[in-house]
Regions:
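Central hydrophobic cores of alpha-helical transmembrane segments
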Residues: 58-65, 104-111, 277-287
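Membrane-interface interhelical loops and short interface/amphipathic helices
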Residues: 121-173
Length: 318
């Protein structure tokens, strides 16, 4: 028992030092922040899987206290909110061996709740208004587009028409941030668990089985979510409310990505059953992404008609 506790203390101390280094580098070099968002959760997952979630919590608390002396207490708290808290939830689910959907969705929701709190704290105590910064960048991008059109010698009517389209596109991009963030963080959680599995296998521990591309299965309501998003986007043309546009855009985004994942899984399954090599399958899958809507239709048919099993039955009969 003492040997186990000693090993846990030593590993926690070493991994806590790594967490502090990753976080300090990410706060000093902004473009490395994505790498920090990947490495810190992996460290906490491995620690939780080997010794329990309480050691991961201890590592986060220790790192936050020490980092408060190097940067500031508030910035240390913001790092815990943005990276530490979602990573701890993911580590807890990894240790408890949650099913894949629960393991990906719950930490993502925690991040989406923690991020507005982080924005509010940044605005209140650091005078960092991310909304104003976004609006300024939005206005600057629109101005640059207009200057580009004028330099090309376009007529005023053409410029105004194109600027209207550009403003609508930028506004739609603003609406889709929530849905795109959800998908992006969920995919990041999958990658984190995949890396943690590799480390656990090398360390002789027990990994958490994750479904590969062949086993990806989206819920059937993905089709209805996508169709509802399409219908609501049509209603936005009749009733131009911002809240309706926000809901329609994010329903459409979430449904689209879920159907895209289902379609990729179905295509990979079809190529696998026909004996294509992994290299050729990856090349064909990459080319299929150039026709995203076609892949989404394949995913929709797979959910509604069980396309992959129909093709598997035909191939076995052949």
């Amino acid at each position: 028992m003492n040997q186990t506790n000693t090993r846990a203390v030593v590993e926690t101390g070493f991994l806590t030092a790594l967490i502090m280094v990753f976080t300090l580098v990410g706060s000093s070099v902004p473009f490395l922040y994505m790498l920090v968002s990947l490495l810190v959760p992996v460290t906490l997952l491995v620690l939780a899987a080997r010794h329990g979630i309480r050691w991961s919590i201890l590592a986060v608390i220790t790192a936050a206290i020490v980092m408060a002396f190097f940067i500031s207490p508030l910035q240390s708290l913001l790092q815990v909110l943005s990276v530490g808290l979602p990573a701890l939830v993911l580590a807890y689910g990894y240790e408890r061996r949650w099913e894949t959907s629960k393991l990906l969705v719950i930490p993502t929701l925690v991040f989406l709740v923690a991020f507005p709190i982080e924005m509010w704290l940044s605005f209140q105590f650091l005078n960092i208004d991310l909304v104003s910064l976004w609006n300024e960048e939005f206005a600057k991008a629109i101005k640059d587009i207009e200057e580009t059109y004028r330099n090309q010698g376009m007529l005023e009517e053409q410029i105004q028409s194109q600027m209207t389209v550009a403003r609508e596109a930028m506004q739609q991009f603003t609406y889709m941030i929530a849905g795109a963030s959800f998908v992006g963080v969920a995919c990041l959680n999958y990658v984190i668990c995949w890396i943690a599995n590799g480390i656990m296998r090398r360390a002789g521990g027990r990994d958490l089985p994750l479904p590969g591309v062949l086993q990806w299965r989206m819920p059937k309501w993905s089709v209805y979510l996508f169709l509802l998003g399409l219908i609501l986007q049509y209603w936005v043309n009749l009733y131009p409310y911002e809240w309706l546009n926000f809901i329609a855009t994010n329903f459409f985004i979430l449904g689209s990505y879920m159907l895209l994942a289902q379609g990729l899984s179905c295509l990979w399954y079809i190529l696998h059953t026909h004996g294509y090599s992994k290299t050729m399958s990856m090349l064909l899958i990459f080319l299929s992404l150039l026709m995203g809507y076609a892949v989404m239709i394949v995913g929709m048919l797979d959910l509604l008609m069980d396309l992959r099993h129909r093709l598997a039955k035909r191939s076995s009969e052949d």
